[in-house]
Every structure is written in C-alpha cells, then in structure tokens.
Amino acid sequence: MSSPPRGEVAARLEPVVAEAVSAAGFDLEELDVQQAGRRRLVKVVVDAEEGVGLDEISEISRAVSKVLDAHEHVLAGSYTLEVTSPGVDRPLTRPRHWRRARYRLVRVRLADGSDLVVRVGEADDEGVVVLADGEIRTLAYRDVERAVVEVEFQQPPAEDLVRLERAADGAPERGGDRGDTEESR
C-alpha cells in the first residue's frame, strides 16, 4: 500500500490535530508531516496567549498522539511526534501573533518596500497600533509584507509603554510624553 503525499497527509490530519490542540486550550500554528527514513516526522507547533510551557507541551503531545494513533491509516506507518512552540523568529502573520507581541520590538517590512522598527501596542483583526520613530500610528495588516519580533536584552522604555497604553485608551498624547517638558529642555 502506498502512502499519500506529504502535503495531503498534513491536510487530512490538520482538522483532527487542531481540534485536539484547541481542546487543550491552545492554538495550532503549524502542522508539518515529513518522511524521515521509514517513519514520518509529524511536527506540531502550538501557541497560546500566555505562551506555552514544558508541562503544556507534554499535555498537548499526549492528546495529539492519541489522535494520530486513531488516524494511523492516514500516516500509513509509524511516526515520530514533535510538539513545540514557535521560535522567536516566527513571522507575525495573524492578528493573534500581533496581540501576543504587545510591547515587543518588531522589525516590519511594508508592502511599499520600506522597513520600520516599531514597538507594538493594541492589535485587532484589521491592524495594530505601533510606536514608530517616536510617533503613534496604525498599521493595517494588509500593508505589512513581513514582521518579526526583535530580541531585546533590556526592558522597553517605560515612556514607550505609557504612550502605547494611552493610545489604546484613546487618550490624546501630551507634550510631556515626548520629553519636551521644561525640565528636559
């Protein structure tokens, strides 16, 4: 009996794997099935609003393993299961990725070819409020070609976070937020 092509296997398994991951309270970010010698490697990438810890990875692994065992006819043989969370270099491609990146520094390539480094504020289903070059602005997802979180080794400036919070609350910016107070002149 021949086994179905790799992409077809993942497509057939995705609904049941997504259901198992969702039932555990997580989001399925990616499902990949590759041939690895005589076995298949099933890679499941999961995430959640609060991140994913090792205990949760174990829980999800058990749930997905049960589902895969029940659908072993799709895999057509033995498999190795790898459950992981996304790496820091994962592109932000969905609104939930942007929500999880709140207050993080992100490198953005816009559809017009320009690049920005922004601090992420509130995100909804259409776009995200960011602090870019000292200015609060809104980026529509349709205008973003690629976005990746930048690794930071220090806490973000408190004034940046305050400005993003005020923008989320709809409060107007005040001059003191940009450092143009009497004391800073």
Swiss-Prot record:
Superkingdom per UniProt: Bacteria
GO CC term (a single one): cytosol
Disordered as annotated region, ranges: 162-185
Keyword list, A-Z: Cytoplasm, Ribosome biogenesis
Subcellular location: Cytoplasm
InterPro entries per UniProt: Ribosome_maturation_RimP (IPR003728), RimP_C (IPR028998), RimP_N (IPR028989), RimP_N_sf (IPR035956)
Pfam families in UniProt: DUF150_C (PF17384), RimP_N (PF02576)
SUPFAM superfamilies per record: YhbC-like, N-terminal domain
PANTHER family noted in UniProt: RIBOSOME MATURATION FACTOR RIMP
Primary role: Required for maturation of 30S ribosomal subunits.
NCBIfam families documented for this protein: PRK00092.2-2
HAMAP family reported for this sequence: RimP
The protein, known as: Ribosome maturation factor RimP
Organism annotation: Saccharopolyspora erythraea (strain ATCC 11635 / DSM 40517 / JCM 4748 / NBRC 13426 / NCIMB 8594 / NRRL 2338)
